[in-house]
Amino acid sequence: MTEFVVLIPARLDSSRLPGKALADIHGKPMVVRVAEQAAKSKAARVVVATDHPDIQTACQAHGIEVVMTSNRHESGTTRLAEASAALKLPPHLVVVNVQGDEPLIAPELIDRTAEVLVENNVQMATAAHELHDFDELMNPNAVKVVLDKNRNAIYFSRAPIPYPRDAMRAGKREMPSETAVLRHIGIYAYRAGFLQRYAEMSVSPLETIESLEQLRVLWHGYPIAVETAKEAPAAGVDTQEDLDRVRAVFQTV
C-alpha cells in the first residue's frame, strides 16, 4: 500500500459544543482519542494541527505529535496546507484529513480513502455512504453528494440531491429509486503538493454559499474520487448528546 500520513485539524472554538477538542472521553481528551484511533490505520505518521496551546499541551502529554498553525484559517484544509508545509512533507506524499471530532472513525475507512486517491490518480478523494432516510435527505446538516459514472463527485450540497421531483409533487416522502442517495463522509485524501495548491486557489462562491470547503476543488476543475462505504460510519461529535453517546461507547470497551 502507498505510504500516507494522517493530519488532524483541531481547533478549540465550536459554536455548538465549546471546547470539544479537549472534552474528556473516558480519561483522555477527544483529540487524543481521534489520534489514537487514526494510529490504528496503516498511516506512517499521525499529526494533530492546531492553533491552540491547550490542545498542543494535551497532545504532547499523551505522546501525540502536534504542529502549531495560524488561528486565521477558515477551513481544516487550509490549516493542513500550512501544517504540511511546516512539516516539510514531500509533494507526492499522500495526506489523509481526519476530522478532529471523529473519535470512533474506522481505521479501515482511513486506509481505503488513501487507496482510492492512488487508484484513481486524482488530486483528491473522499467517501460517502448510502442514505435511506427521507428526513436525512432533507436535513441540511447531512451533506449529500452525486456522482458521475466514473464515481467522481459532480456536486456536494446541503440541499436534497438528487431531488425526487415526482414524489414531491405527489406529496410523497419517498427516496429516489433510480439511483442511490449518498451522504458525504467528512474524510479527505490528497497529495501534500495539492494541499498547497488548494490554499492558493481563490475561494469559490459555491463554497461560501454551502459552507463546504470541498466545493473549491470542483469549482477549479479538479475531480474528486468518491469511495462508497458499505455502511454508515460512527457519527462524529457536534453536540453534547453526541459526546454523551461516544462516552458511553468508550465505557463499554
UniProtKB/Swiss-Prot annotation:
<dbReference type="InterPro" id="IPR003329">
    <property type="entry name" value="Cytidylyl_trans"/>
</dbReference>
<comment type="pathway">
    <text>Nucleotide-sugar biosynthesis; CMP-3-deoxy-D-manno-octulosonate biosynthesis; CMP-3-deoxy-D-manno-octulosonate from 3-deoxy-D-manno-octulosonate and CTP: step 1/1.</text>
</comment>
<dbReference type="Pfam" id="PF02348">
    <property type="entry name" value="CTP_transf_3"/>
</dbReference>
<comment type="pathway">
    <text>Bacterial outer membrane biogenesis; lipopolysaccharide biosynthesis.</text>
</comment>
<keyword id="KW-0963">Cytoplasm</keyword>
<comment type="function">
    <text>Activates KDO (a required 8-carbon sugar) for incorporation into bacterial lipopolysaccharide in Gram-negative bacteria.</text>
</comment>
<comment type="similarity">
    <text>Belongs to the KdsB family.</text>
</comment>
<dbReference type="InterPro" id="IPR029044">
    <property type="entry name" value="Nucleotide-diphossugar_trans"/>
</dbReference>
<dbReference type="InterPro" id="IPR004528">
    <property type="entry name" value="KdsB"/>
</dbReference>
<keyword id="KW-0808">Transferase</keyword>
<dbReference type="GO" id="GO:0005829">
    <property type="term" value="C:cytosol"/>
</dbReference>
<protein>
    <recommendedName>
        <fullName>3-deoxy-manno-octulosonate cytidylyltransferase</fullName>
        <ecNumber>2.7.7.38</ecNumber>
    </recommendedName>
</protein>
<dbReference type="GO" id="GO:0033468">
    <property type="term" value="P:CMP-keto-3-deoxy-D-manno-octulosonic acid biosynthetic process"/>
</dbReference>
<dbReference type="GO" id="GO:0009103">
    <property type="term" value="P:lipopolysaccharide biosynthetic process"/>
</dbReference>
<keyword id="KW-0548">Nucleotidyltransferase</keyword>
<dbReference type="GO" id="GO:0008690">
    <property type="term" value="F:3-deoxy-manno-octulosonate cytidylyltransferase activity"/>
</dbReference>
<keyword id="KW-0448">Lipopolysaccharide biosynthesis</keyword>
